[in-house]
């Protein structure tokens, strides 16, 4: 049976790149994002190009009812099968700690951590059931089920003016660790992919400081996600850091 994935933040940037990469691998998908029109355009493209089933589930990850509805739509469409929950939706706003508005912290917390936590919680029964299925009919591999979260290198190494964003991404890394501790023996594991600056609309403000050819591409991140979901259930990868050339992960 075809593997399925629910991808949030799928209308552009990293989420869209992940959708394209998995569709090219024959996955059936549910694409979620706040704005319906770009989702429809991408879904039509993937159906035509790869012949896969693609559902769209518009919803605001800052709204609890929308998050619930996104999960429900995927599980209904694919009879409760969920091989990969890809948490790509995210938002970031820069500002020093001293003057950062708490309302902006609350919004980043809602989108970057609360929604992923809720989706993991609501999808866990389906992830467990999918992980219990037999080996892949073609490859013979028992993949289990995966949660893959797009985190950030700032969740590992602090950067000035990104305290709120970094804190939510560090929490996302911790959430993946907790999923592994609680669920990996049953075949459900989680991986946080933590890239540095990725060349997307969200980082366009960096183009005057960092050459675009030196930035990580959305396709780089998508390739790492595809690699993780191709592993057997015996391989648990808690996190993957992606840095640009010449950078250091850990500071002395």
What are the language-model segments listed below?
Residues 120, 168:
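Active-site helix of classical SDR
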Residues 98, 157-163, 214:
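Active-site loop immediately N-terminal to the catalytic Tyr-X3-Lys motif
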Residues 185, 192, 200, 208-250:
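C-terminal helical subdomain
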Residues 96-97, 101-109:
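Substrate-binding pocket helix/loop in short-chain dehydrogenase/reductase
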Residues 152:
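Residue(s) in the substrate-gating loop at a strand-loop-helix junction
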Residues 25-42:
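Conserved glycine-rich Rossmann-like NAD(P)H-binding loop of the short-chain dehydrogenase/reductase
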Residues 11-12:
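Conserved glycine-rich cofactor-binding loop
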